[in-house]
Design a protein with these regions (language model features):
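N-terminal secretory signal peptides
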Residues: 1-18, 22-33, 40-43
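Polar/charged side chains located within well-ordered beta-strands of beta-rich proteins
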Residues: 23, 275, 340, 388, ...
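Histidine-centered copper-binding motifs that mark active-site loops
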Residues: 39-320, 326, 332, 358-400, ...
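Active-site pocket scaffolds in enzymes
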Residues: 40-41, 155, 161-166, 170, ...
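Extracellular beta-strand-rich recognition modules
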Residues: 141, 279, 338-340, 507
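Exposed beta-strand face motif in extracellular beta-rich ectodomains
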Residues: 188-190, 334-336, 502-504
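Terminal connector regions
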Residues: 198-201, 333-359, 509-517
Length: 526
């Protein structure tokens, strides 16, 4: 009997009152059934479908003898600049109308050398979109690239046909208008990036990523000044050009050698302890474990906006695509260093030293601040009526003898390696279905040897519990998210519902893994 069947059987045996108390601790009592997925993983790997379009032409490799840019050539230590704002072309109340032109642009980051980027409106970093709950958006997107693209409004609850999925490409030379209304109670820190079939990772590392902030007319912290820290990374060769991925990038996700904040390398940041800071992990695969020696973070928000109460943190863990809202607490004025401590995510075929990464110098001014006891009233979802199981895995048979394979064999192996429920992604296949407005619990299980951040389109979820090495833990605090890390052999219980009918994606947000097939299609029906 599978975990899903056991849960449903348990629900039938329990009366309504007791079922409302049914939680992750009950799941733990199921023992082996909860610890083991519903399919035998060996047979899944043996029989997984590789009949999808195995077009491996998108898998390109950088030269093996590639020489990278000397870090000393990259300007550093400059005062951090604010993100540019996307101009609202409308003068109508509650209407945000704008244009995003996606095009190549040569930008001089390195003195005397211009780097070819993909850009939104010619800018790196991209312009920040700032809107309010209830606003209606009309964004004209002109694709001036030589390839198809989309814009995915990551985490923003929009209808499926406006979500920039790989099913709705904007072909080279074409344009379209994205139209959607920002729902009430959706204030939070989001971002936008491409989501075309096979090439999301390339288009992001070429420069396409921007901040997207939804504000409430009034919330517990709306009186505070704000700053954005959009963290990305960049790889440049000795000619200051952005090279293709190497094999390790395809296996583990690309981590550029230059970690940037708002497009700047090791900047100086002026902050005050009464500033609301939005931090974005806009990298393809880099995990961030942020800390400020001599100071603490005050966590006030996650992907989906403010949390119930402020939480003091020595470190902030952000998997790729995650965002947080914080303030900084320090005993006095001073100069501090923003760093990212090493996080071992069990990469394939790579040995790393556990080095701490220096990101920026912070000049911090101590200001008076009284945080309210409660930041937001959390409105939990109802108890679940349906359950789903997601198994993220890797086909180790494809990895066998990899270093001895030809380039064409490597490409085929890569395109068949990263799986969800034993399958590699097929654009035309429906993998799961959900009912509109019905609350579901998803059990997301990582049966691979490395970390994978799980992301779902169209909604946000609440983490209910996690299980690792037989130990079940309830979530540390209540919050809505759209992206969450899943460690090797870990099981997460996520509660969610979909409020729009149509097709959605769920996938690993290491973008190379997404492109290589660690993704599925969810059909939402009435």
């Amino acid at each position: 009997m599978t975990i899903i069947q056991k849960i449903k059987q348990k629900e039938k045996l329990m009366n309504r009152r007791n079922f409302l108390k049914f939680n992750a601790l009950t799941l733990a009592s199921m023992g082996v059934a909860y610890a083991n997925p519903m399919h035998d993983m060996h047979s899944m790997h043996k029989n997984h479908s590789i009949n999808h379009d195995l077009d491996t032409s998108f898998i390109n490799f950088a030269p093996k003898n590639l020489k990278l840019l000397d870090p000393k050539q990259f300007p550093q230590g400059e005062i951090l600049k604010a993100l540019p704002l996307l101009k609202n072309e409308s003068k109508e109340k509650n209407i945000f109308r704008a244009t995003l032109e996606i095009k190549e642009n040569h930008i001089e980051l390195i003195k005397g050398k211009k780097t070819l980027f993909y850009t939104y409106n010619g800018l790196v970093p991209a312009p920040k979109i700032e809107v309010f709950e209830g606003d209606k958006l009309e964004i004209l997107v002109k694709n001036k690239l030589k390839e198809a693209t989309t814009i995915h409004w990551h985490g923003v609850p929009v209808p499926p046909d406006q979500d920039g999925s790989p099913h709705d490409p904007i072909l080279a030379g074409e344009e379209r208008i994205y139209r959607f209304e920002i729902p009430q109670d959706s204030a939070g820190t989001y971002w936008y990036h491409p989501h075309p079939h096979y090439t999301a990772s390339k288009q992001v590392f070429m420069g396409l990523a921007g901040a997207f902030v939804i504000k409430a007319k009034k919330d517990a912290l709306s009186h505070l000044k704000e700053k954005d820290l959009m963290i990305s990374d960049l790889r440049l060769d000795e000619n200051a050009q952005i090279p293709n991925n190497n094999l390790n990038d395809w296996l583990n996700g690309r981590e550029g050698e230059f970690v940037l904040i708002n497009g700047q390398f090791k900047p100086k940041i002026k902050l005050a302890t009464n500033e609301r800071i939005r931090i974005y992990n806009a990298t393809a695969a880099r995990y961030l474990n942020l800390r400020i020696q001599g100071a603490k973070f005050i966590l006030v928000g996650t992907d989906g906006g403010l949390i119930e109460k402020a939480i003091y943190k020595e470190e902030l863990f952000l998997s790729p695509a995650s965002r947080v809202e914080v303030l900084i607490d320090a005993p006095k004025d001073g100069n501090f260093k923003l760093e990212s401590a090493y996080y071992d995510r069990d990469k394939m075929m790579v040995k790393e030293e556990s080095n701490t990464l220096f990101l920026a110098n912070i000049n911090l001014k101590k200001e008076k601040l009284e945080l309210p006891k409660n930041l937001k009233i959390f409105k939990p979802l109802e108890e679940p009526k349906e359950f789903k199981e997601i198994i993220m895995s890797e086909d180790h048979m494809q990895m066998h003898g990899m270093m001895g394979k030809s380039e064409s064999e490597l490409k085929i192996a890569l395109a068949s390696m990263f799986l969800i429920n034993g399958k590699s992604y097929d654009l035309k296949r429906i993998d799961l279905s959900s009912k509109l407005g019905v609350v579901e619990d998803w059990i997301v299980i990582n049966k691979s040897h490395m970390d994978h951040p799980f992301h779902i389109h169209g909604t946000q979820f609440e983490l209910i519990s996690s299980k690792l090495n037989g130990k079940v833990q309830k979530a540390e605090f209540r919050a809505f998210r759209d992206t969450i890390n899943v460690r090797p052999n870990e099981e997460l219980r996520l509660r969610m519902k979909q409020d729009f009918k149509g097709l959605r994606m769920y996938h690993c947000h290491i973008l190379e893994h997404e492109d290589l097939g660690m993704m599925g299609n969810l059909e939402v029906k009435e």
